[in-house]
């Protein structure tokens, strides 16, 4: 794993953009009871201000996708970024933790950004595993094909495991929730922060229970 002990002036902002009310245990756990209430789930993207620009972690989904999947957009991501003084054109790099619909939508909102993705996530999202309805349910064909178009436009950098994005910002493949799920480690003045994405949604996912939210083996412990 790439490591650094150097503190940086990186600043991390959590931008909440959507919400899903009325979730059940079946929404949060494989094998969960569809009659058991499980509360709401909030959706975020993460903006990292660096000394050289802005790195965005994930791009969320838009209002059309929210309506299709019965979610509620609280405010568009572009509006949320503007509230902290960031314009879409300020984003130099986008780290896509994985290609699920709630992490890889809004694919036309950041026209000048370079995207960062794990090799095996693109392989997973375009290969034979998508013939399985259970594995593809969280993917949207438009999001995946948009990423393919970015590859052909020379706007994607692929990583195989650990990789460096900017000073003090690295990615690390975890797997589990999706084959190429990657977390982001950010060095800040207060110390390192790990944006673990969907390695775990809830504290309950860290407990030894009989059901989980993982569909594939994990690459490492979180």
Model-derived features with residue positions:
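Active-site metal-binding loops of divalent metal-dependent hydrolases
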Residues: 59-62, 99, 120-121, 176-178, ...
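Zn-dependent metallo-beta-lactamase
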Residues: 1-56, 61-63
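Residue-level marker for buried hydrophobic side chains located in beta-strands
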Residues: 55-57, 95, 193-195
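Divalent metal-coordination and catalytic microenvironments
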Residues: 48, 58, 91, 98, ...
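Conserved small/polar residues in nucleotide/adenosyl-binding loops
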Residues: 212-218
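Core dinuclear metal-dependent hydrolase active-site scaffold
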Residues: 14, 46-49, 55, 158-189
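Metallo-beta-lactamase
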Residues: 3, 75, 80-86, 90, ...
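Active-site metal-binding motif and surrounding structural segment of the metallo-beta-lactamase
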Residues: 72-117
């Amino acid at each position: 794993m790439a490591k650094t002990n150097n503190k940086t002036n990186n600043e991390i902002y959590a931008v909440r953009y959507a919400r899903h009310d009325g979730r059940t245990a079946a929404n949060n756990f494989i094998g969960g009871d569809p009659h058991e209430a499980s509360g709401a789930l909030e959706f975020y993207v993460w903006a990292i201000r660096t000394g050289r620009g802005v790195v965005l972690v994930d791009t969320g989904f838009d209002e059309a996708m929210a309506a299709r999947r019965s979610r509620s957009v609280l405010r568009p991501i572009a509006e949320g970024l503007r509230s902290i003084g960031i314009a879409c054109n300020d984003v130099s790099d986008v780290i896509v933790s994985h290609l699920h619909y709630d992490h890889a939508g809004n694919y036309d909102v950041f026209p000048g950004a370079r995207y960062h993705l794990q090799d095996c996530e693109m392989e997973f999202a375009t290969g034979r595993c998508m013939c399985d309805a259970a594995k593809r349910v969280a993917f949207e064909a438009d999001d995946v094909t948009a990423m393919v178009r970015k590859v052909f436009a020379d706007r994607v950098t692929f990583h195989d495991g650990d990789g460096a994005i900017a000073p003090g910002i690295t990615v690390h493949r975890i797997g589990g929730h999706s084959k190429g799920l990657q977390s982001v480690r950010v060095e800040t003045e207060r110390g390192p922060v790990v944006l673990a994405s969907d390695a775990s949604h809830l504290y309950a996912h860290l407990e030894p229970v009989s059901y989980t939210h993982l569909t594939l083996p994990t690459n490492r412990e979180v």
